[in-house]
Each structure stands twice: as C-alpha cells, then as structure tokens.
C-alpha cells in the first residue's frame, strides 16, 4: 500500500447502489493508490461487478462520493469517466465480429480520447497507431492484429477486450473476471500478461473467482458479501479470516490456497 504522503487515485466513500429495496453495494469505502493492484472476490451476487459498474458510470451510485484524483465522478457518464482515465473490461467477450483485432483496439483507443464525439476521431494517425501497437504488445496480440474477431478463441477475445481498454491509456484499469472459462494453462498466460501490466505501473482493480489468480497478483484483497466489504487486507490475512472462510472460501479451499502461498514463498 502507498505511504501516507501519497494521495489516492480513486476514493469511494459511503457508496450505495440500490435496485429497488436491495442494496447491491452497501456503504462501501475504498481508497486506490497509484500502482495498486486490488483484487475483489466474493460469492456470486456479492456486488462485485455492480461496484465496477458504479465506478465506471454504467450504473450510477444511488448515493455516496466517488472521486478520481479529487474530481467527483459519481454522476458522470461512462464516456466522460473514460476520458478522465478509467477504463474497464467486462465478463462477456464483446467485440465487433467482422472487424480485426487491430480495428477493434482502435475503437478502444478512440473512445479514450477526451474529445466531443469519438467516431469523428477514428483516424489511424501516429498517436493512435502508437496506442494500439503498445496495447497489442502488452496483451501479446501483436502477431494476430489482422485476425477477424469472429475467428478468435475465448482467450484471445478476452485479451482483445483488455487491449481495447489499455489503448485508452487509463490511469485506472477495471478488469472483470479476466480468466473465467479458461483452462489452467490459459489462466497462467493471462497472469503473465497482467504481471507485465503491473511492471508497467498500471493501477488495477480486478474481480476474479479463480483465487490463485487473485491472490498471486493482488497487493490488496477485498472480499464482498451481500454488497458489503467483509475483508480488506493482504492474502495471508484473508486465509486466516474466519468470516471469509465461512461465507466464501470454505475450509478445503483455504487450506489449498495456504499451501499454494507457502510453496510460492519457498520458491521465491
């Protein structure tokens, strides 16, 4: 975690999101500092994706304060929030099916421009080309740039969505279940790519149910349950937290993750 002199990049205070009488996000506080990698876990329906929807403006908060670098964003629209520096991926592998990887990533880069209307700026000038090329390299897609989206396997579709988000050059990247539906080898491939982003200094909030992925990448872990934050801290503290074990992990999973963390520590 950042030292006390560092100002948060993102602050969330007393954030609520109601759907009718249901509090999908319930009095949620979070500080995100530059360079943070925050992993959010929890059972299905805990409010994880809704929280990202609130931050990114897709589903505005019912109440509460959210600020990026001190600028209030709780009532801003998604495009305005993206222009300020927050980009995200989604659980569904969305893309323009008849367009290439490169063209899809260009759409992402264009959306990130702080300009009135983004379609008029979809020109492949030098700035745009550099953004797209860098994003494709970071996601290991540079050799597949001409492939059409409809022909891509699930892994490459997930990486394409990540590349599109990175092409906006975000200050904060929100990643929603990047390895859902992937096999263990593919999970490792995505983990390596995210580790590269961390080395680049990208600030990340990621949601994931695959706990080995979440624990190995996150500097700080948050667990949600019924819209509330029931844990925030490091990986070791998570495995020793009785409430987290009871409502989410279970004894067997906690023991396996503990063993994994011990082996990782032994092997450096």
What do these predicted regions represent?
Residues 173-177:
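Catalytic Walker B motif of ABC-type/P-loop ATPase nucleotide-binding domains
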Residues 118-150, 192-195:
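Conserved ABC ATPase "signature" region
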Residues 41-43:
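The feature captures the beta-strand-to-loop junction immediately N-terminal to the Walker
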Residues 169:
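Conserved catalytic motifs of ABC-family nucleotide-binding domains
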Residues 165-166:
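ABC ATPase C-loop
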Residues 56:
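Helix-to-loop junction immediately C-terminal to a conserved catalytic motif
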